Amino acid sequence: MKRLMIAVLCLTLVLFGCSRKQTAATTAAPEVPFGNYIQPAESFAGGSGTQEDPFQIETVRQLALLAEVINRNYDVEHYDDEQLYRYGYYVLTADIVLNDPADFDTWQEAAPQYAWEPIGCKGEDGLLYEFRGVFDGRGHTVSGLYLPGDVHTEGGGLFGRVSKATVCNVSIADSLLIAADEEEAGLLAAQCSNSVIQNCQVSGRVSLRNTYYGGGVIGYAGGKNAKLKDCSFSGSLTAQAVSGQVGGVCGYLACPAEGLENHGALELKDSPFCDLGGIAGAVSRCALTRSSNSGSVTARTEAGSVGGICGQLSAGLTWQQDGNVDTVAATEISGCVNSGRITADSSEQVGGIAGSGFNCFRDCGQVTLRDCGNTGTVTGLSKVGGIVGELYLEYSAYQIENCENAGSVEGQSRVGGVAGSVGVNKGPSAMDGCENRGSVTAAEDAGGILGWGVDMNLDWQKETDSGALSILRCRNSGAVTVDSGTAGGILGRLMHPGGAFAVDISRCENTGTVHSTGSGRLGGILGGCTAGYVIGRDEGAACYIRYCVNGGTLSYGDAAVNAAAPAPAAGGDDQTLNATEKALSTMSGSAAGGIVGASFQTVVESCLNRGQILLSTGTTPIRNYAEHSAVSGESATVFVGNIYGLFLYSPTDPENAFEREHITDCAYTGGFDAPAYAPFLQEESPVISGNRRISEEEARTLAEEMLR
């Protein structure tokens, strides 16, 4: 009876089921050679399809039989048999070879003998013919799969669509998938819904064109009961004219995943709205843990978000079928490592771990990056970070905890050793225990930990919302270099409304050099802050810096000399400055301070500067004038101070000035007489008080106490 049923089914390439279409793709693409299809066997090697007695597959024809019984429609008479096969248990008992891989490198030009029909599809009748059983490869390998794209596969590989299924313990090797004009594509499966995929290793080539979700292993994986574990991809993946998400393992990941690895080279072009990641193009409302990427991730032209582990992180809400909110869904990446080179010269939002993070619903879940590390080189246009390029969260907080970067990070603006750019409305958010050892290079706005930060304070916020950001216990030893603009050993530039949205930088240390090849504002901890009253708010300090230590050197120009040299005798060539006049005319000019370069509404308390400040303008050294703590050369004016370069004290509200901005109880070992240059400040004001010069020996002891 069973053989008769199979014989009948083999003839049903007819009215319903999945048909092998031979139509050309709707977008222009290279002509793809076709192969023939292997003839399915009449029966499996053994078994009855139950958990205790699974169907056994030992030949390629028996594997093709599995595709046949899943993909074809059944009449009512054979409904029970359909359910048995669709929900059945299957095991491989031998390695399977569809095509000899000896000429694998030429398959895109010359088709091998056989093409493969994926297991599970969407039929031309609109029904889903999904695999819903259990497939256990038992450690065996399926090799030589050829999927030319102009078939009914919908971008499928070994499987097309799986739902409420388990696929485990199987490897795919020397296989080629070409997908054009498909929703999802992957060499193991195009779509996995509410399924468990475990211990699957995939090696081969994937070529995508005009595909939405694409991955080396899976195109889309999601669902309340879904999980990916211990899966990997190696080989190459190229994508062109893609508008969704592309990843080395999974294109769009919306379920818990752990132990994923990518060793393949990923390349994207002509896809300005596509997110690209070494593991996943997007990670949404789930946790990705203990995963790694060693493959190169390259966006040849402008792309969306690009990252070593994932392109885009998104938190949100999980919906029930009736449209009601089921859960508030957070997104977390933890214990993940990238060592691959990340290159996206024409793209914003580029990171060693994640390209970007965002959310789109009020009161939705938090975004967290924890215990992650990057050693790969990261290059982008702007919003570039060793860990994350940009976090722009309008509706929830974020946490970056115990993350380390040792790779060089380079871009034009908003570049950071840990994060390039952050913006948050609802907090509190934190960067805690992070470290950068890699070089950070930008045209402007660069920081050893964070390049550029803003608390957005949108009009719709509740009075109880807080956008506060804390940068705690972070360390930078990497060199920070800008062409001009603003740079800091910890934070480059802060744009901030102040008040309840203040930024707190505490117990952080910088030992890296902070250098500008031209002009700019340089700080050992903070480069500069544009704050409250400048944009219509005057609600207290915008930034608090406490118990921070700088041991890094600040410098300008290529021929830096020690700016702590004594002032020349009267009648010398150098000129003193009219302090107030210069401050008024050069508020956007250069300033260098051991802790802060130049800032509005910033409180600095109990900090230590052990670093030097070196200055030059071309071939003319700039020397310090102790009277004003300002120095001038041929064509530049630089305001300098042991703690604070240019203290932009606001004289509009002297009675409340201390609450908004002050420099107190700080220590320094540098050569300048004054802790700060403060052109608007009257002498002996309490806003600058209790600061002192100490010996290097005292500084060592004090630094240990501050950083405990």
PLM regions and their residue ranges:
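Surface-exposed repetitive/solenoidal architectures
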Residues: Q22, A28-R708
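General helical structural elements
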Residues: A7, A24-A25
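C-terminal motif of bacterial Sec signal peptides marking the signal peptidase cleavage site
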Residues: L15-G17
